[in-house]
């Protein structure tokens, strides 16, 4: 079961950038729970985090497989990424854009991390069975 960071926890950024490459290996379910944790931020700024994927590093596309909404505050933000329709995706990488406006320094500052955890096939089966009964 995959449990890894697309962006290491408490990474500090002041400009747009990319996280390290994450090799997906042999996923059982091809469904990931992505957790964006913003542990530090200043006022009047935003961050947008998207997840890019492909067969290998040169094959990572420009269009995201998933994107968190534009965020402004500290907190934990979950997002499910279903890769069943993208069988060629073997590696993932996080990309972020930051922006700051208003008074004071115009340099944005965020401290955050993005964790990817594989959702177990058993849990997916249980949820699917529960949905059919409802």
What do the PLM-derived regions correspond to, one by one?
Residues 26-33, 44, 88-91:
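Extended extracellular/luminal ectodomain segments enriched in beta-structured repeat modules
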Residues 66-104, 110, 114:
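Beta-sandwich interaction modules
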Residues 48-52:
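Beta-strand signatures of extracellular beta-sandwich domains
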Residues 1-14, 21-24, 62-69:
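Local beta-strand/beta-hairpin segments that build beta-sheet-rich folds
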Residues 38-46, 100-104:
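Extended, low-complexity, turn-rich repeat/linker tracts enriched in Gly/Pro/Ser/Thr and Asp/Glu
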Residues 15-36:
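Contiguous beta-strand segments within globular domains
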Residues 1-4, 8-12, 30, 101-134:
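C-terminal interaction-tip segments
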């Amino acid at each position: 079961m995959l449990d890894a960071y697309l962006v290491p926890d408490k990474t500090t950024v002041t400009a747009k950038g990319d996280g390290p490459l994450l090799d997906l290996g042999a996923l059982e379910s091809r469904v990931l729970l992505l957790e964006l944790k913003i542990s530090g931020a200043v006022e009047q700024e935003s961050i947008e985090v998207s997840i890019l994927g492909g067969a290998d590093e040169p094959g990572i596309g420009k269009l995201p497989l998933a994107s968190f909404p534009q965020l402004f505050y500290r907190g934990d933000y979950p997002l499910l990424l279903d890769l069943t329709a993208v069988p060629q995706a073997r590696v993932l990488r996080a990309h972020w854009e930051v922006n700051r406006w208003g008074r004071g320094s115009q340099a944005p500052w965020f401290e955050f991390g993005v964790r990817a955890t594989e959702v177990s096939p058993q849990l997916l089966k249980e949820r699917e069975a529960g949905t059919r009964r409802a």
